[in-house]
Regions:
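Loop/turn elements at helix/coil->beta-strand transitions in domains of secreted/extracellular proteins
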Residues: 59-61, 88-92, 118-122, 154-156, ...
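Stable alpha-helical elements in mature extracytoplasmic
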Residues: 58, 76-79, 106-110, 119-123, ...
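Extracytoplasmic thiol/disulfide redox context detector
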Residues: 1-100, 173-176, 211-214
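C-terminal cap of thioredoxin/glutaredoxin-like
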Residues: 1-27, 150-214
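Structural microenvironment flanking redox-active thiols in thiol-disulfide oxidoreductases
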Residues: 86-149
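Sec/Tat-exported extracytoplasmic proteins
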Residues: 69, 84-87, 115-118, 127, ...
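Solvent-exposed loop/turn segments at secondary-structure junctions
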Residues: 68-71, 98-103, 129-134, 165-168, ...
Length: 214
């Protein structure tokens, strides 16, 4: 690599680190529709049997309440992927849905519909890798999500049935309700072994996970 290219890559990396730190320090995104506390009877369940898992069998459980359209979630996605690579065999990473933006419910439906065919993670990655194609649009982006399902080679009849199944919507709404009852008001919000995390840096996240694994 040339010196100029090396310098450019170093500057880009540094800028990304600064952005992630700033997002963690600033707190999460409450979205266009803020999730207020749920005062209905009952308490929130942090992880349900049908909660999507990106890894299993770990000694610690890391839970993220996320919104696929949330700018902070999108910016922190590479960091979460790095944590998964670093700790994936020792930590169970769980996704909980907290849709707050215009197309985030439809995105969550696409992810859950893909999960019916064992492809949650593939759709999860696709959604986070392509926010510029569908995010922050005033019009529904269902056609885009169905296009992603085709690209992933899913059975489209099964995908459509799952996407439109009231039970799929119910799972997502249950996840959001759980989050509200647990005090989640924005995304991303993290929990580790049942305790809420309020990190201000990536190092804080790593230190918390390391402590949980000791």
């Amino acid at each position: 690599l040339s010196k100029n290219l090396k310098l450019s890559l170093a500057l880009i990396t540094a800028a990304l680190v600064v952005l992630v730190v700033a997002l963690l320090a600033a707190g999460n995104d409450s979205g266009s529709e803020q999730a207020g506390p749920d005062d209905s009877a009952g308490t929130g369940v942090l992880v349900r049997e049908d909660s999507p898992r990106l890894s299993e069998g770990g000694d610690a459980v890391f839970v993220e309440f996320l919104d696929f359209e949330c700018e902070a979630c999108i910016a922190l996605y590479p960091t979460i992927e790095d944590l998964r690579e670093q700790y994936g065999d020792r930590v169970t990473f769980v996704v909980r849905h907290m849709p707050l933006h215009d197309n985030s419910m439809a995105a969550a439906l696409a992810a859950e519909a893909a999960a019916e065919q064992g492809q949650f993670e593939a759709m999860y990655r696709k959604l986070f890798d392509t926010p510029e194609q569908w995010g922050h649009q005033q019009t529904p982006q269902m056609d885009t999500f169905f296009g992603y399902a085709e690209e992933l080679g899913l059975d489209m009849d099964r995908f459509e049935r799952a996407y439109n199944d009231p039970a799929t919507l119910s799972r997502i709404e249950q996840s959001k309700q759980d989050g509200q009852r647990l005090g989640v008001t924005g995304t991303p919000t993290f929990f580790l072994d049942g305790e809420r995390l309020d990190p201000t840096s990536v190092t804080d996240l790593e230190n918390s996970i390391n402590a949980a694994l000791e």
